[in-house]
């Protein structure tokens, strides 16, 4: 199976069963088709299974990858689909388009207007509302309004009263001289409702329900109650499109397994025209990571500052304002809050997809290590150990090692190292120290040696490791280096005395395995570094507090783990773990200075 087909197959397995839009892309990464679905997974799978007509078969033959955006409802999917089609103008949306268009509700431009469901928009003949995702939702909305407002129903004015008049659903303008101002008020209320303003109609129905109930007309009161519930179920708040034309960017994020995904929705003229997805291995707290990201997002001249930036409420508004020179909004409720939540939900879906794909890819790792061994000219590397350093300007330098056996992570054999002999930010010496410590212990304890050692770095890192292995420890183990491009993505595998590039195809299983290894060792190293910095910061604070010695420091660290948790603790919390009252009081005061 061709590699792109396998990637598509893998991704199909992790698409959620939620409403949303999907974008099909060709070999040039151009959007060639945009669609919507009530259940994304089912719809996307349908393209790659079973028979199709000639046009759809041609479309599927050009697809090399796809993306999707989760929405909160089928209606949102429709509106987003229309925006995306307008933005990208995919050629297959034109080729596959038939005579069927989306339904609208129309208020006719007549002396006594009517409500219609139509798929044809003719300018100057009335007001149109929609589009609706399907005819059923449009008809249900019209039926609801017909029950509430006695609007004219007949196409042509009859010469006698019809059934609708006798059941209270028409004022009978065909026979009676109906007050035009009363009709105009009905038209206004219907227009407001179709524009999303349902408060007026709900208030009116609630008043009618209360009046009927007080008059002991419980059957009529129940009818009004049912209408209220029907409106609440039918009214679908639109988050993707808005009448608010303010230019804004909406941020949401999710954190899991040492990774952070940030989603940005670009809202222009009330429409979401684009979204940006960024994956970041966590090196700081999630809040600190977000502040760094959003500052770079606008300061590197990659994006134009909008009028407003919307962010989650857990973040420090002043901190963001210090790096982003525009209005910062943290919505507490309503459609704007819903949009921030939707961005966060899409971030969660993206992270879940990343982890699911990694898990599924493990089934093909044997082929990957065989391919890797062949390309490097070494025996199949059953056991691979990879190293990476982490520090900030030489502060609290650490290193980490991950182990892959048969191409799969062997987490019980992961190791963490605090750099002991190197002063300042010296990556080469740090790598030499860690490799020396690791394989000295392996030799002393008779532990298994790896078939391949991978370092995160280039020729300098490789030469340092080879020197320690061969000249200090007498070991002959293949050593390779992994380099990243300016986007911090795995780009090249280096091997040999002159650190030559190993010719691996970027879409090969071997290259993808290397990408996974580099991601994993980087994640493991920076997670350890963050933990080390937090503990170091906590210890330095504790050192300045009277009554806190080594034993009590250890007790506090073991009980609370972080300065944030200690600041949240009460005096009783400190006393409950054995800290004397006077020391606990002093500690509490110092932490809250």
From Swiss-Prot:
Subcellular compartments: Cytoplasm
Pfam families: GIY-YIG, UVR, UvrC_RNaseH, UvrC_RNaseH_dom
Protein name in the entry: UvrABC system protein C
Region forming the signal peptide: none
Primary residence: cytoplasm
Listed GO CC annotations: cytoplasm; excinuclease repair complex
Source species of the chain: Staphylococcus aureus (strain JH9)
Protein origin, superkingdom: Bacteria
PANTHER family tied to this protein: UVRABC SYSTEM PROTEIN C, UVRC/OXIDOREDUCTASE
Keyword vocabulary terms for this entry: Cytoplasm, DNA damage, DNA excision, DNA repair, Excision nuclease, SOS response
Assembly with partners or alone: Interacts with UvrB in an incision complex.
GIY-YIG domain ranges (all copies): 17-94
Physiological role: The UvrABC repair system catalyzes the recognition and processing of DNA lesions. UvrC both incises the 5' and 3' sides of the lesion. The N-terminal half is responsible for the 3' incision and the C-terminal half is responsible for the 5' incision.
InterPro entries membership: GIY-YIG_endonuc (IPR000305), GIY-YIG_endonuc_sf (IPR035901), GIY-YIG_UvrC_Cho (IPR047296), RuvA_2-like (IPR010994), UVR_dom (IPR001943), UVR_dom_sf (IPR036876), UvrABC_protein_C (IPR050066), UvrC (IPR004791)
């Amino acid at each position: 199976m061709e590699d792109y087909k396998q990637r598509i197959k893998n991704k199909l397995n992790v698409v959620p069963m939620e409403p949303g839009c999907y974008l099909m892309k060709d070999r040039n990464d151009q959007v060639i088709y945009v669609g919507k679905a009530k259940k994304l997974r089912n719809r996307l799978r349908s393209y790659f299974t079973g028979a199709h007509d000639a046009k759809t078969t041609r479309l599927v033959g050009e697809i090399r990858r796809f993306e999707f955006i989760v929405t909160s409802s089928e209606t949102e999917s429709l509106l987003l689909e229309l925006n995306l089609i307008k933005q990208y103008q995919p050629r297959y949306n034109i080729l596959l388009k038939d005579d069927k268009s989306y339904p609208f509700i129309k208020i006719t431009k007549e002396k006594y207007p009517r409500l219609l469901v139509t798929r044809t928009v003719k300018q100057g003949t009335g007001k149109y509302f929609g589009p609706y995702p399907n005819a059923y939702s449009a008809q249900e909305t019209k039926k609801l309004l017909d029950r509430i407002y006695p609007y004219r129903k007949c196409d042509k004015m009859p010469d006698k009263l019809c059934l609708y008049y006798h059941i209270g659903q028409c004022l009978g303008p065909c026979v009676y001289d109906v007050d035009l101002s009363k009709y105009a008020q009905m038209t206004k209320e219907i227009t407001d409702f179709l524009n999303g303003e349902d408060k007026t109609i709900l208030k009116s129905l609630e008043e009618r329900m209360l009046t009927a109930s007080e008059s002991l007309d419980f059957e009529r009161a129940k009818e009004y109650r049912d209408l209220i519930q029907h409106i609440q179920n039918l009214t679908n708040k639109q988050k993707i499109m808005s009448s608010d034309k303010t230019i804004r960017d909406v941020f949401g994020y999710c954190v899991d397994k040492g990774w952070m995904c940030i989603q940005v929705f670009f809202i222009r003229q009330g429409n979401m025209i684009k979204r940006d997805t960024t994956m970041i291995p966590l090196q700081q707290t999630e809040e600190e990571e977000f502040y760094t990201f959003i500052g770079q997002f606008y300061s590197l001249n990659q994006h134009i500052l909008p009028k407003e930036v919307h962010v989650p409420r857990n973040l420090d508004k002043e901190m963001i304002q210090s790096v982003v020179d525009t209005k910062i909004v943290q919505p507490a409720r309503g459609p704007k809050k819903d949009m921030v939540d939707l961005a966060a939900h899409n971030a969660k879906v993206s992270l879940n997809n990343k982890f699911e794909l990694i898990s599924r890819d493990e089934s093909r790792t044997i082929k990957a290590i065989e391919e890797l061994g062949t390309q490097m000219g070494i025996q199949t590397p059953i056991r691979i150990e990879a190293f990476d350093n982490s520090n900030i300007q030489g502060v609290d330098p650490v290193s980490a090692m991950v182990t892959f056996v048969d191409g799969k992570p062997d987490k019980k054999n992961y190791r963490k190292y605090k750099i002991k002999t190197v002063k300042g930010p010296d990556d080469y010496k740090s790598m030499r120290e860690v490799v020396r410590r690791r394989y000295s212990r392996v030799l002393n304890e008779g532990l298994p040696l790896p078939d391949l050692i991978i370092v995160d770095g280039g020729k300098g890192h490789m030469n340092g490791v080879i020197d320690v292995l061969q000249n200090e420890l007498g070991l002959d183990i293949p050593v390779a280096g992994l380099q990243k491009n300016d986007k911090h993505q795995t780009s090249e595998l280096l091997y040999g005395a002159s650190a030559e590039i190993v010719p691996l195809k970027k879409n090969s299983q071997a290259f993808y395995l290397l990408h996974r290894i580099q991601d994993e060792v980087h994640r493991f190293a920076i997670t350890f570094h963050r933990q080390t910095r937090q503990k170091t910061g906590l210890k330095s604070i504790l050192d300045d507090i009277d009554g806190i010695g080594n034993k009590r420091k250890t007790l506090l660290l073991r009980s609370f783990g972080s300065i944030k948790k200690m600041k949240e603790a009460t005096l009783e919390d400190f006393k409950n773990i054995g800290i004397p009252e006077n020391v606990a009081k002093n500690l509490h005061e110092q932490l809250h200075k």
